[in-house]
Amino acid sequence: MSDRGRTLMVQGTTSDAGKSTLVTALCRWLARRGVAVVPFKPQNMALNSAVTADGGEIGRAQAVQAQACRLAPHTDMNPVLLKPNTDIGAQVIIHGRAVTSMDAAAYHDYKRVAMEAVLASHGRLAAAYRVVMVEGAGSPAEINLRANDIANMGFAEAVDCPVILVADIDRGGVFAHLVGTLELLSDSERERVRGFVINRFRGDIALLQPGLDWLEARTGKPVLGVLPYVSDLHLEAEDAIDTRQAAKVGPRLKVVVPVLPRISNHTDFDPLRLHPQVELSFVGPGQALPSADLIVLPGSKSVRADLAALRERGWDEAILRHLRYGGRLLGICGGLQMLGERLHDPLGLEGAAGSSAGLGLLALETTLEADKQLRNVQGRLSLEDAPLSGYEIHAGVTRGEALARPAVVLDDGRADGARSVDGNVMGTYLHGLFESTAACSALLRWAGLREVQAVDYQALRERDIERLADLVERHLDTGRLLALCGEPHA
């Protein structure tokens, strides 16, 4: 299968080298030029996911890249999504739908089937768009993963596309990363690499130039540009929790998020991290929950196991103390399920079959079922009747008298979530609550912030995507990039 000139792939020398960011930047740059461009990631492993318009599930990075292309997210943009649910196993999602869970060894054998889904999705996108901008995963030089590879060079070879290799200079060793990666590739794979992008550079570019000259002479491949380090660029993290915060002055609301072993969709908290009046703290193992105005129990891929971890760390008692002193508590998705009285997993969907006691803070019980609920929704928060948009990704069905006091009333007539009688505890299945300006402001007032500054998170994300495209224009060889995309340089 040949699609050279219409498909361009970005691979990285390491995880977090800048692949997602570079693909986002290139997508918006091409879209601004009027090119019909679409993002694509063959295989993604992440617990941060988004719901598509066609009712499926893809990695959140591809949803952001879709926004960069000015497109609605679609399952073809990320045909294989792996969501880890144990240290050695993951739920396998094909074309937006969960098909099974398996351990790493079983998935290695399954990759041939997964590759069929990957190539089918790519074929549809390549037929519909002028440029398919592809993001690799991790590094193409992982020797133990080379067999049956579908995420990096295995895919590039299958569709016969050129590759850009990106490396992060800020972590050090950039020349070793680039040259070493090339050395570990096969001859045909090495030939496929058409140039390098160096990411996160700080300082005087003139001091770097001798190294760039050496790299080009050593490899025979061009450096397509050097992107600067941008400290205040805030796009949603693909997997690792982003703990950076915007500069803040004045009184702030203290919000604490316990980081559980299988935390999912922690991008829910990005709007709080960037809010000028919020001091957001992620608390990990071995740490006590600090005093706070609001504690938020996040989503979880393994709710019963994470509930056990919460108890082992003594956080359940800390949460009860927090409530006794007048603090507020919010549970999102799996966090909502933890707030109830019982959690049942009769099918063993998230581990061993069985039931667990919840925190008992809402009169609810949840039963996990095989069918996952995947919806983009609109509605109104019960607090202040604030309008909101969000999305559901969950396998649980929750019942109980607390549902008579819903947290959200959806436009489709359904009620979602619950509130406690005293109003101090609230839970909802909806992710993305804080991205809606009015709902975020209402929740912050509920948690104790009297005068709330309205922040348009969607506008902030759009601004940063535009900034990325500006960086492409200023710092990369756009002529060569257009040639790699099969586009005229005009």
From Swiss-Prot:
GO terms for biological process: cobalamin biosynthetic process. The active site is at C333, H431. Residues 252-439 form the GATase cobBQ-type domain. Gene3D superfamilies: 3.40.50.880, P-loop containing nucleotide triphosphate hydrolases. Keywords: Cobalamin biosynthesis, Glutamine amidotransferase. Pathway: Cofactor biosynthesis; adenosylcobalamin biosynthesis. One of its GO terms (molecular function) is catalytic activity. PANTHER family: COBYRIC ACID SYNTHASE, DETHIOBIOTIN SYNTHETASE. Belongs to the CobB/CobQ family. CobQ subfamily. HAMAP family: CobQ (MF_00028). Catalyzes amidations at positions B, D, E, and G on adenosylcobyrinic A,C-diamide. NH(2) groups are provided by glutamine, and one molecule of ATP is hydrogenolyzed for each amidation. This is Cobyric acid synthase. It comes from Pseudomonas aeruginosa (strain LESB58). The gene is cobQ.
